Amino acid sequence: MARKFKLNEDKFKVAFIFANEGCNPKKDRSIIESEKIIMYVVGCADYSQAETVAQEMLEEGCAAIDLCGAFGNEGVARISKAVDRQIPVGAVHFDFHPAFRDKSGDEIY
């Protein structure tokens, strides 16, 4: 069951997770806060780390997770499964990503 979010009572919390070899989710993170939104930006070295971060973001109370273009179809499915579909998971989508020598994250991670 999806979590209910009341925009008038809380700031809207969302997460943006990006993947790149060498990222450390414990140090490669930032919080961007505006009047109505808190966005957690977290870098992960692979899909496994991203699954752990997604679960952390669910516990933090995020209403949605956005994934960078490095996540292929398999990666998006893994993150959705990691949060047990309790919150929506969306993604910027590239069939192949120029930053990864025209490969999908599915081929790398």
Give the ranges of each region predicted by the language model.
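Alpha-helix-loop-beta-strand connector modules within alpha/beta enzyme cores
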Residues: N73-F96
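Hydrophobic faces of well-ordered beta-strands that scaffold small-molecule active sites
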Residues: V14-F16, Y40-V42, L67, V89-A91
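Long, charge-rich, low-complexity intrinsically disordered regions
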Residues: C23, R29-I32, V42, D102
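Active-site mouth loops of central-metabolism enzymes
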Residues: E35-Y47, Y109
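Amphipathic, hydrophobic secondary-structure cores in small proteins
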Residues: Y47-N73
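Short, charged, surface-exposed secondary-structure boundary motifs
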Residues: H97-K103
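Short, well-ordered coil/turn segments that N-cap beta-strands
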Residues: D10-F12, G61-A63, R85-I87
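N-terminal basic/disordered segments at the start of proteins
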Residues: A2-C23
